[in-house]
């Protein structure tokens, strides 16, 4: 422990002495509480003398009551006078009458259990011995036949199974005959003497009885007899296992196994694998300081009584924790066994009782591992201690990683357009509840801020509470004062990324709904159709400072996943801004335009108003001299602080003047978005230019849409101080709402364009479909080919319809159509909606089991009869039925996808949670070579070179093609430099990457580069692992579930796409045979490609190393990627499809694997229009590929098969070389997301992910020490996390919070 909490945590196997040390007393009675007095029974499971008093400072018998007796122990009832909370931490114990094996060490599927590995007997044999089925040899004695010992030590005698019992019985009979022969020799074969010898007669009798397989007597007698004569000792039960473990010499065993591994001819056979497992286990126990026999317990601990409470229900009934039932059973059986032992009961009865005791203890520790778990009255298995640890409802995930918190509430959200960006409206009722302690403290305050005495509003807490309850008028000024002291934190579930939790300054509102600022809805993914949000209150000074400086909504301008503005206005606001920035010719000219455009342009000058100031122009609009969208002129001098390309008359509209007033004074005037970047110089008529000529050629500019407005906000963020952006956004929001109201945009079914062209297309396609049907019936086409062509035909028809509709809505006729305006501005709707409303619904999907797709068949997941009608026309009955089919599939897909995507996000977070920015520069000289990602099929760009290198550090100095310096090595590549690199024709750039960062834990600032959410160098302490996982997981729900098929002929590649593809890549799942690409294992040239008549596929022959050849057969429907004469490298695709990552690692190395995964992940996301920075994918991949498996330990002390991180391996190898020792060798590994978290080196983090039991068993066996490097481990133990402000001083955090508070407007 230290000032800052726990420094590290070790887990090990508890020794009997340790258990006694924990315990405050032995429990001998199974009773819980007295049914009359409801007090705990002495010596029972709730005994107060062991676990502490039930009531604070009050003993069992009532002799001592009150805190003044604290620390005394009552002479009568032996209860210590203390607080009752000790009942949560004090433990008891049960002394077992017979040793019991710990189920975690005997049953550990799928791998062999620890006891089985230590004793080198099979898992099944351990089980049989422990459960009193079979005997085990403890000592082979001097029992020899043919020069060999009949029994081997640790040999298990199977006398129960008909198959194996013959061999064991024969061995026993052989031993009995040995005894007979020895007695015969002693008595010189005298018949009389032999008949009278009791032992001889007994040996003969036992021998005869053992002939029969159904042994009708206790074998124990035979074994006792054999032991007496030969010294061979047999044992059964946990007692026998314990004795063998006690006698185990770990040092000897270790050397023996090492020798056996060295002598093993095959390093990969099952025998060697088991030897390696044994070596690992023996070394763990040897190095841990634990003794193997501690795996078999002679006493068990009893958990504190408050952790397994007994609760009284109505009607005098009780309910209790399942744990109590287990303990009760153990105590009853244990006490019964003690009595039997005291009365010298027969061995067979004792063994039976010991087995029952073993089973009772097993069910306490792990009820579900048993074949027949102990069930309750309702026939459900009772929850054992293992169940309390694992799963979502277990201790780790339910109680340690996520807790319910006080000072919180939740309510429905409604929009609050009047709020500032950092404000939230909290209902008065909620404020009274949440801020109650602060309000009361203010009401009873006797001194003011300066320390002067004042008259309190309420004399005491009780009166203050009454005033709050009555909602007295006197409390409201106090409430207003109190809520200014601290912000509140808002959270909307599901919290898919860090912007799902933000802080706001509270503002009291009427009603019961929380009022939310409209601009933050995108970040929360909230809408106002009944969504609820939770409110939390930061209590400590540090928490308040953190909320104000880091969590406040107005600081979150850019989304962390792509660095794009996340507070872009939406819907009504967009509509208002679109209307406000729209340009029109003056009304008279507009009317003329329809009749005579040339004359209208000449007349334009007579209706062109020029103003000298902004106010004058706005006044003219208010007086209705001009309309808000009319093109007008205004002198450039009317705009102070703004720079123009020249002086003169700026051609703009009143709407644009009003819009520009929302921006800071020195911000460029936005007449068109291009103005921001100096393109298309401002529309200014210069001092000596002809106004008439200018106006004649004038074309109306496009208004601002959602997309262009986002560009404006992005630019504003780049050039302004952080506090200016939210102020400007609030002004834009207000303008948006105001002018969407003034625009009076309405919506009606008759606004939808009418369209009839489609029926001609339908006629053509129907004819084609019937032709295809005839071809199929004539046997010219297979059903698969017919289906594919039909679907393709209808898809093309819909494409034509879509194209027509697009042309229609972009035509002049519909430019003022309200629905078209909504779609064009980006407020609501898109072309696909118009196609369905005015054109046709098209083909619908149907349910299809993608997992069972056959090898060569076509995926028939589309109903081949399209829906020809549009929604405006209305659907026919059959069309409605088909469309409901697709709609339902869509709903179920979404539900499935959400769950799967959530699980993937959890796995991503668990894999990367320990990755934090640790230092400024790790000094690595390695990087990754980055090229543009292109889709090789249609040669389109998926991600440009600029997108991939911007915000990263260069490894080498970069020159353009003319040898002119662009950027030096180890310098940041800004957006401008990235543009120059891309335009100079450079195809690839080597940059720093998290994949090659040499920091021992985490990543350095330079290897990561710019923080996408601030556009500044990433700060130390940023938990980029979690941010990367969120950025990849959050859009996961937007990925499609279906497998795209490229349409066209059967045999075109059916490649898994969308979410399933991401899962395949990150979980390292082998692609199915029919979509797996054939890759080259060698570097060479394609010699020839031959058709294989047997398989209908191809044989691709590659020549390598001058005159070596290798042949790659392909499946029948494979699409080739190579042609004769092509140069080919190892790992390159020969056929289309998905590459198996493990094959790629084998033939092309880890770097190619990393590049492949980045490229494929980007392909999936970008094809869905989701932009994610490469850096995040690299952080994830670095965690999947940063482990290495030892193949030869050299002199390092590591062992074969051990998995360690690359950085650790490098350190060990360097030390070996420096000390002139033999370094270890190893191979790279790729782990999927399912296995990566358990390889993190922290058992707490791994156990809270999956396989809790196995991870804790392994960690305890090796006495593992958790150094608490990651975030989860620290959360579990209640430490501050080693990231963000957790690494800073408290004073520093508070000072920063106060500084940022001053920046609020």
Curated annotation (Swiss-Prot):
GO molecular function terms attached to this record: DNA binding; DNA-directed RNA polymerase activity; magnesium ion binding; zinc ion binding
Q: Which InterPro entries match?
A: DNA-dir_RpoC_beta_prime, DNA-dir_RpoC_beta_prime_bact, RNA_pol_asu, RNA_pol_N, RNA_pol_Rpb1_1, RNA_pol_Rpb1_3, RNA_pol_Rpb1_3_sf, RNA_pol_Rpb1_4
Give the protein's cofactors.
Mg(2+); Zn(2+)
**Residue sites binding Zn(2+) 1 per the record:** 59, 61, 74, 77
What reaction is this protein's catalytic activity?
Answer: RNA(n) + a ribonucleoside 5'-triphosphate = RNA(n+1) + diphosphate
Q: Name one GO biological process term.
A: DNA-templated transcription
Q: Where does Mg(2+) bind?
A: 527, 529, 531
Residue numbers binding Zn(2+) 2: 922, 997, 1004, 1007
The alphabetical list of record keywords is: DNA-directed RNA polymerase, Magnesium, Metal-binding, Nucleotidyltransferase, Transcription, Transferase, Zinc
Gene Ontology annotations for the cellular component aspect, listed alphabetically: DNA-directed RNA polymerase complex
Q: How is the cofactor bound?
A: Binds 1 Mg(2+) ion per subunit.
EC identifiers of the protein: 2.7.7.6
Stated family: Belongs to the RNA polymerase beta' chain family.
The entry's function note states:
DNA-dependent RNA polymerase catalyzes the transcription of DNA into RNA using the four ribonucleoside triphosphates as substrates.
Matches recorded under HAMAP family = RNApol_bact_RpoC
Could you give the subunit structure recorded for this chain? Answer: The RNAP catalytic core consists of 2 alpha, 1 beta, 1 beta' and 1 omega subunit. When a sigma factor is associated with the core the holoenzyme is formed, which can initiate transcription.
Query: How is this protein named in the record?
Result: DNA-directed RNA polymerase subunit beta'
Q: Which gene encodes it?
A: rpoC
